[in-house]
Amino acid sequence: MKTLYSLRRFYHVETLFNGTLALAGRDQETTGFAWWAGNARLINLSGKLLGAHVAHAGLIVFWAGAMNLFEVAHFVPEKPMYEQGLILLPHLATLGWGIGPGGEVIDTFPYFVSGVLHLISSAVLGFGGIYHALLGPETLEESFPFFGYVWKDRNKMTTILGIHLILLGVGAFLLVLKALYFGGVYDTWAPGGGDVRKITNLTLSPSVIFGYLLKSPFGGEGWIVSVDDLEDIIGGHVWLGSICIFGGIWHILTKPFAWARRALVWSGEAYLSYSLAALSVCGFIACCFVWFNNTAYPSEFYGPTGPEASQAQAFTFLVRDQRLGANVGSAQGPTGLGKYLMRSPTGEVIFGGETMRFWDLRAPWLEPLRGPNGLDLSRLKKDIQPWQERRSAEYMTHAPLGSLNSVGGVATEINAVNYVSPRSWLSTSHFVLGFFLFVGHLWHAGRARAAAAGFEKGIDRDFEPVLSMTPLN
């Protein structure tokens, strides 16, 4: 069995297996890859690779539309979203669609529209994917040079990179437009317990926006995950969108510098590995963001964060015992520290007990009770409102944790309450996907570097152990 030398010259990786499933131009004889190697067979067939990518986009959008409609069909307005296992409707709610004061759902029709639009879009993408995979030209270079490319063409590759950056920038600005002009977005910090509002006073100060990037990721600093007002989030999208668009234009107009030509591997598999690394980083950041941040991911829709549930429990029992006559300012706990209140390392008054580790928490239901030096004792005695008690009791019993024993002092009740927080799902899934994308990055980067160095040849199939074994049948 012979692999075409002309193809091998540009792609030095041979992975030879039996070529029983023959597809003209996509079989093992002509590509050096068996059917299960998927898109590797299309490395030099830009038209077919386009079909694969468009079809893949169709599958993604189909899932979004179908899952969206599934959630709408099962949605019960009387229960909070996070009690219903929803992962898509909370995103739409955060964007301000169908939501009234306090995060209450007043209209599910926008969610239905979103699902239908995604389904229709997926049909268009699916048709395009099938067309380009089966009927369209195998390669685009001859008939549509603008869409054609050769992997080694560094200038063309950076032009494609530039186009992608511009599209990402446009996406960032879509959120800005929604927040500024098209109905606004949901602000969990709005007075009176959260509401949809238009963002009027954008934060555009570079020292504030880029200050987040310079913060420590630990403790009370929290890097970009610590952002806690929408002005900063939307202003950050203005900066990000602008940088992406200007960077995209720059990459389209310029050619790679000499140091970049030398430092990077310029092959399809190398670009795949770079992309996987970038997506992996995005996954890990998203994991931390959805776990800790209750501004971009409002607790009204996603359920409380872990620290928030723990602090809510301390607050709930402080309220109860204060009513029973306890002096919460001076009561001593079993460790000799304050039972209800204590001081943080920097002197602020914070909740005592196991939840002391979460003293950094900021949440809309708790901030009104703070003074210049942390929790204000007189406010805790006189100013606690019924809505704060209700919300903290609700959050206390809906921690994003499932455990047989106490976790940070939170009542998890995993055997009594059939509840898994969307925060748990979204954090865990993004961590796991981020990890596997990172492994994929290492794999493809190693193969791409080996191919560039010219020493990867795959396994020698002539002396493979399985060939000397008795057939299974």
From Swiss-Prot:
Query: Pro-peptide positions?
Result: 1-14
Residues modified as N-acetylthreonine: T15
Could you give the cofactor binding note from the entry? Binds multiple chlorophylls and provides some of the ligands for the Ca-4Mn-5O cluster of the oxygen-evolving complex. It may also provide a ligand for a Cl- that is required for oxygen evolution. PSII binds additional chlorophylls, carotenoids and specific lipids.
Which terms are listed as keywords in the entry?
A: Acetylation, Chlorophyll, Chloroplast, Chromophore, Manganese, Membrane, Metal-binding, Phosphoprotein, Photosynthesis, Photosystem II, Plastid, Thylakoid, Transmembrane, Transmembrane helix
Question: Its membrane topology, per UniProt?
Answer: Multi-pass membrane protein
Q: Which domain of life is it from?
A: Eukaryota
Annotated S-S bridges: none
Question: Where does it reside?
Answer: Plastid, Chloroplast thylakoid membrane
Give a Gene Ontology cellular component term annotated to this protein: photosystem II
Main localization, broad class: plastid
Q: Where are the transmembrane segments?
A: 69-93, 134-155, 178-200, 255-275, 291-312, 447-471
* Nucleotide-binding keyword on record: no
User: Carries keyword Phosphoprotein?
Assistant: yes
GO MF entries: chlorophyll binding; electron transporter, transferring electrons within the cyclic electron transport pathway of photosynthesis activity; metal ion binding
Q: Which family does it belong to?
A: Belongs to the PsbB/PsbC family. PsbC subfamily.
Subunit and interaction comment: PSII is composed of 1 copy each of membrane proteins PsbA, PsbB, PsbC, PsbD, PsbE, PsbF, PsbH, PsbI, PsbJ, PsbK, PsbL, PsbM, PsbT, PsbX, PsbY, PsbZ, Psb30/Ycf12, at least 3 peripheral proteins of the oxygen-evolving complex and a large number of cofactors. It forms dimeric complexes.
Outline what the protein does.
One of the components of the core complex of photosystem II (PSII). It binds chlorophyll and helps catalyze the primary light-induced photochemical processes of PSII. PSII is a light-driven water:plastoquinone oxidoreductase, using light energy to abstract electrons from H(2)O, generating O(2) and a proton gradient subsequently used for ATP formation.
Q: What is this protein called?
A: Photosystem II CP43 reaction center protein
What organism is listed for this UniProt entry?
Answer: Aethionema grandiflorum
